Amino acid sequence: MRECISIHIGQAGIQVGNACWELYCLEHGIQPDGQMPGDKTVGGGDDAFNTFFSETGAGKHVPRAVFVDLEPTVIDEVRTGTYRQLFHPEQLISGKEDAANNFARGHYTIGKEIVDLCLDRIRKLADNCTGLQGFLVFNAVGGGTGSGLGSLLLERLSVDYGKKSKLGFTVYPSPQVSTSVVEPYNSVLSTHSLLEHTDVSILLDNEAIYDICRRSLNIERPTYTNLNRLVSQVISSLTASLRFDGALNVDVTEFQTNLVPYPRIHFMLSSYAPVISAEKAFHEQLSVAEITNSAFEPASMMAKCDPRHGKYMACCLMYRGDVVPKDVNAAVGTIKTKRTIQFVDWCPTGFKCGINYQPPTVVPGGDLAKVQRAVCMISNSTSVAEVFSRIDHKFDLMYAKRAFVHWYVGEGMEEGEFSEAREDLAALEKDYEEVGAEGGDDEDDEGEEY
């Protein structure tokens, strides 16, 4: 088996995790108590969903996941929620005091006390796998736990499981919406370690997802639940090929191979289509070509950056539902002829496609309509650099005055780490610039298409 272990860190990671496991359970017909009436083989079995769930002798399906937070409130919601019987109590790890939005607390003082316990639990899950494929790590880099403890865990995982791939689903701070003042510090410090210790990182950004909810689902005031359900559809589409059998399967390591041209250039944009509400879906049936086009719309991107400002290096399209390879090839052919979607000149083909015959599932009472087919796109585009330059700019404004730095130094960090991390990100922006630079071609012809 090719198992995947999910690690959910901090409030964002856990709440996105809740949405994902809720969706996985619905997709596989697993009840909130872990029983699965449709599963005939008792014990492990070779069923595809065993990549994400392990099975006990009593026929209970347990997610291969760990939830970690430095304070108990968010995990207590899991402990008392609908899916409380799904998880083994040891999988839910919580501390006593939180990281207080401080990277240094999450990484050094408080995170240090809990990290060995986490690794121990992860080790138990890993021992339970026959062929561990890698880790999916969910966190946000704006807070203290997601950024600090998240980086610490990733660093330790690199030591213990060097060759296993690590896929990050990372919530980045939004341009306008901010939940804390020191977000830029935490993000820069955390990205510094994401650069080294994840193989692929998929950037998510609340503001972009708010806008999608408002625009496409007509939700005037989206809640985190609305956001997370949308994100969980993306993550479900990515992992569908591991959990179901399909026509063109895509493995986690395949993402890496196809999307990452250079080790540092591994921050991806994601988009999902169709995002339509139930009342709209009633009147339109979306073809493969239409959903493919809308996946490339800048407005569909789940991070606030405009892919028209950059060039694509590679794209991964994961279709699910009633889709045949012929339609996919036609849709991709059309995309390639569009002048607005530009690829770097050194990567002419740039498309990796996966098809899964399992149609997308929707959460009952959720916002998304039940559709016959959907597509999720993960793309590596040079425009991602916008996200970093925005955070770097905010970092510089604060760091020039050394504002708030004493909170970090007081928790055992050194000021040098700030400048080291900041230089690393400056280098990353430069890398993106060079990757997008043409081989001697001029850049004047971009104006007229839009």
UniProtKB/Swiss-Prot annotation:
GTP binds at Q11, E71, G144, T145, T179, N206, N228. It catalyses: GTP + H2O = GDP + phosphate + H(+). The record marks Y450 as: Involved in polymerization. The active site is at E254. Mg(2+) binds at E71. GO terms for cellular component: cytosol; microtubule; nucleolus; plant-type cell wall; plasma membrane; plasmodesma; tubulin complex; vacuole. Pfam families: Tubulin (PF00091), Tubulin_C (PF03953). The keyword ATP-binding does not apply. CDD domains: alpha_tubulin. Residues 430-450 are annotated as: Disordered. Dimer of alpha and beta chains. A typical microtubule is a hollow water-filled tube with an outer diameter of 25 nm and an inner diameter of 15 nM. Alpha-beta heterodimers associate head-to-tail to form protofilaments running lengthwise along the microtubule wall with the beta-tubulin subunit facing the microtubule plus end conferring a structural polarity. Microtubules usually have 13 protofilaments but different protofilament numbers can be found in some organisms and specialized cells. Interacts with TFCB. There are six genes coding for alpha-tubulin. Tubulin is the major constituent of microtubules, a cylinder consisting of laterally associated linear protofilaments composed of alpha- and beta-tubulin heterodimers. Microtubules grow by the addition of GTP-tubulin dimers to the microtubule end, where a stabilizing cap forms. Below the cap, tubulin dimers are in GDP-bound state, owing to GTPase activity of alpha-tubulin. This is Tubulin alpha-6 chain. It comes from Arabidopsis thaliana (Mouse-ear cress). The lineage of its organism: Eukaryota, Viridiplantae, Streptophyta, Embryophyta, Tracheophyta.
